[in-house]
Amino acid sequence: MTDILRRIEAYKREEIAAAKARVPLEELKARAADQSAPRGFHAALAARRDKGEFGLIAEIKKASPSKGLIRPDFDPPELAKAYAAGGAACLSVLTDAPSFQGAPEFLTKAREACPLPALRKDFMFDTYQVFEARAWGADCILLIMASLGDNDARRLEEAAFALGMDVLVEVHDAEEMERALRLSSPLVGINNRNLRTFEVDLAVSERLAAMVSADRLLVGESGVFTHEDCRRLEKSGITTFLVGESLMRKDDVEAATRALLTGSASIMAAE
């Protein structure tokens, strides 16, 4: 685990302990049970793939630790509507506050504003967080293999499946991919960003995609800025992408989303 991830785990453990003190697990489970059924995150992406279309997980992200504030006029419901109108298949919403200025209500309000399934984008370490995610309306959780041991990853995955949620398993290298493929989730995200250096290289996805059989649905994460980037990864069998910052920086998010997916304009090229 990198120093960055160790720091994140430390504050997450403190957050989780405080949350458990505020809302006991049984109360949280009741809140999760009161939610409407998950919308089918994997199913939405698989439907796009099966129609021969690109699938986009469009991210609602206010800030990042490496870039600082990304979008000053940050309105999660309006962004969700723009993404849906532009052709996104799913949402990803940051709920981590210390590093990304995220919040639970961003997820809840974004999902309420559109029909798309939503991922809780956060650092997951405890099954309590899985119940949190469902109570907030999430349809999917993220497991970052760089921050989890195999037993912890399996336990979190099982908790999500028991709630009818999907799981996006994120990897960055071959060792993490091998571990991810021992889990049950068909959704595997390849993060092209090195968490040690923050450098981004699409070749990471191209290398790791060769390790994966057709029964998994691969997601290219980080470094996808243009329709041409999508076409490049398509050659390696990746037709689903998680994109945040490049869309968040655009004035017309709907048009930028459409351009990314269809190549209908050059709006994505100017960063």
Curated annotation (Swiss-Prot):
Domain of life the protein comes from: Bacteria
This enzyme's EC code(s): 4.1.1.48
Biological pathway: Amino-acid biosynthesis; L-tryptophan biosynthesis; L-tryptophan from chorismate: step 4/5
Annotated disulfide bonds: none
Chemical reaction(s) catalysed: 1-(2-carboxyphenylamino)-1-deoxy-D-ribulose 5-phosphate + H(+) = (1S,2R)-1-C-(indol-3-yl)glycerol 3-phosphate + CO2 + H2O
One biological process term in Gene Ontology: L-tryptophan biosynthetic process
EC main group: lyase
CDD domains reported in the protein's UniProt record: IGPS
Keywords attached to this entry: Amino-acid biosynthesis, Aromatic amino acid biosynthesis, Decarboxylase, Lyase, Tryptophan biosynthesis
GO molecular function terms noted in the UniProt entry: indole-3-glycerol-phosphate synthase activity; phosphoribosylanthranilate isomerase activity
SUPFAM superfamilies xref list: Ribulose-phoshate binding barrel
Pfam families, alphabetized: IGPS (PF00218)
Record-linked PANTHER family: INDOLE-3-GLYCEROL-PHOSPHATE SYNTHASE, TRYPTOPHAN BIOSYNTHESIS PROTEIN
Stated family: Belongs to the TrpC family.
Protein's name in the database: Indole-3-glycerol phosphate synthase
Species per Swiss-Prot/TrEMBL record: Rhizobium meliloti (strain 1021)
